């Protein structure tokens, strides 16, 4: 028997065994990541969790993943250096946020006297030349909020919202969250906010930021002309907190933050975690500002001696790291999005029914929009979310309506959708 015939027989035997196993339901399957349901080899970082794939199979020395049994002295020093925490400035220089969208986001929490915290996903653009983030839309997913924290819940519409943003030419540029009033001298971000920001940067890139919206005590207008830090955005609800007076000026401020590349790397390794104390730790500023690390880290601080020489001084290793070492501040400005508005009802608000056709009718017939065409009226992110999750649910309709909203032109296609909606709203 020739070698060719032997190979053919072997292949036939393998095929027969595979068919037998297939009928028995015992065929081998490609192992998938539990979070993203994709093979681990498809990407080094899980797009769902933001962690490295196959962490349990990676060898960690210091703060570096090692793939060889032999490591050079320079690699060892670099691995040890990864365990020394150094503060770095933000890579993003400015965050511009649509004023209407961020004000509607915070106004609901302000109505609850800041006793129900919320978070939202930000969609916009990133300018590589100026290192600027533009936030054009704010979407609030399903979530459960409490006085000190919020917990994301599965959102059935999240995939559709992502498609709408992409069809409008937008991408995910970060997250926003609220928190109760706090003393910035004691705490800037708590560990949950730090991990939220880090996860966002790990999943969607370093062009993401965290916006925090909260009441803040500011110098009164009589004693000082400055009511905010440089680059800090003050929203419209300047007296949203109960008890606010002219003497004790309480404003609602919006600040932007970014975590360091080192923080993102440690998060991907799975070593940055919530402290053992859980949510109770959020009620104490000293505990809330500490993020837990599964391996001890040294904080490296630059000091200048009396003669002017700079040197690094490292503190003793610790598993509790102040979030200030991992975060940097970004200036914030408000602007009006030229792409979409954000005035329509939100799809998910606790204690409030979801929008219905009556709400859409009131919105479309509002006298403020009397001079607008149909294409201009539906150029609202939350109108599109409502239409494309409740009425027009196919991908073709999504692309068509988003194209109408983006161009704001009354094409024949736009007129057809207008006629359909008018018929539905008149019944």
Located regions from the model:
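Extended, low-complexity, intrinsically disordered C-terminal regulatory tails
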Residues: 341-347, 351-355, 362, 366-372, ...
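N-terminal beta-strand/alpha-helix entry module and adjacent surface
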Residues: 1-174, 178-315, 320-326, 332-338, ...
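Basic, Gly/Ser/Thr-rich N-terminal segments that form RNA-phosphate-binding interfaces in CRISPR RAMP
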Residues: 359, 376-377
């Amino acid at each position: 028997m020739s070698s060719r015939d032997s190979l053919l027989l072997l292949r036939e035997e393998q095929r027969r065994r595979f068919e037998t196993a297939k009928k028995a339901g015992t065929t081998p399957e490609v192992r998938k990541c539990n979070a993203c349901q994709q093979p681990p080899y498809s990407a080094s970082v899980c797009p769902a969790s933001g962690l490295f794939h196959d962490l349990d199979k990676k060898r960690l020395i210091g703060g570096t993943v090692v793939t060889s049994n032999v490591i050079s002295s320079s690699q060892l020093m670099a691995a040890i250096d990864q365990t020394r925490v150094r503060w770095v400035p933000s890579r993003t220089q400015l965050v511009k946020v649509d004023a209407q969208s961020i004000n509607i986001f915070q106004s609901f929490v302000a109505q609850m006297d800041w006793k129900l915290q919320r978070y939202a996903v930000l969609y916009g653009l990133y300018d590589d030349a100026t290192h600027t983030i533009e936030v054009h839309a704010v979407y609030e997913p399903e979530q459960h909020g409490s006085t000190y924290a919020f917990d994301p819940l599965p959102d059935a519409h999240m995939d559709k919202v992502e498609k709408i943003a992409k069809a409008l030419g937008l991408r995910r540029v970060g997250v926003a969250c609220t928190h109760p009033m706090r003393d910035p001298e004691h705490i800037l971000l708590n560990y949950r906010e730090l991990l939220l920001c880090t996860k966002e940067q790990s999943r969607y890139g370093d062009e993401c930021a965290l916006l925090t919206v909260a009441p803040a005590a500011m110098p009164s207008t009589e004693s000082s002309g400055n009511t905010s830090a440089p680059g800090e955005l003050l929203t419209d609800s300047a007296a949203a907190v109960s008890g606010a007076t002219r003497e004790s000026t309480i404003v609602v401020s919006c600040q932007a933050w970014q975590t360091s590349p080192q923080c993102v790397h440690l998060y991907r390794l799975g070593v940055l975690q919530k402290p053992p104390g859980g949510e109770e730790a959020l009620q104490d500023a000293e505990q809330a500002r500490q993020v837990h690390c599964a391996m001890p880290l040294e904080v490296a601080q630059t000091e200048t001696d009396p003669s002017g020489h700079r040197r690094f001084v490292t503190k003793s290793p610790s598993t509790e790291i102040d979030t200030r070492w991992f975060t940097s501040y970004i200036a914030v400005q408000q602007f009006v999005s030229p792409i979409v508005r954000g005035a329509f009802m939100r799809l998910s608000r606790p204690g409030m029914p979801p929008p219905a056709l009556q709400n859409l009718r009131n919105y479309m017939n509002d006298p403020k929009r009397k001079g607008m065409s149909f294409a201009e009226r539906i150029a609202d992110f939350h109108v599109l979310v409502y239409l494309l999750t409740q009425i027009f649910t196919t991908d073709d309709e999504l692309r068509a309506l988003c194209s109408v909203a983006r161009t704001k032109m009354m094409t024949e296609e736009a007129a057809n959708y207008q006629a359909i909606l008018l018929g539905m709203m008149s019944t």
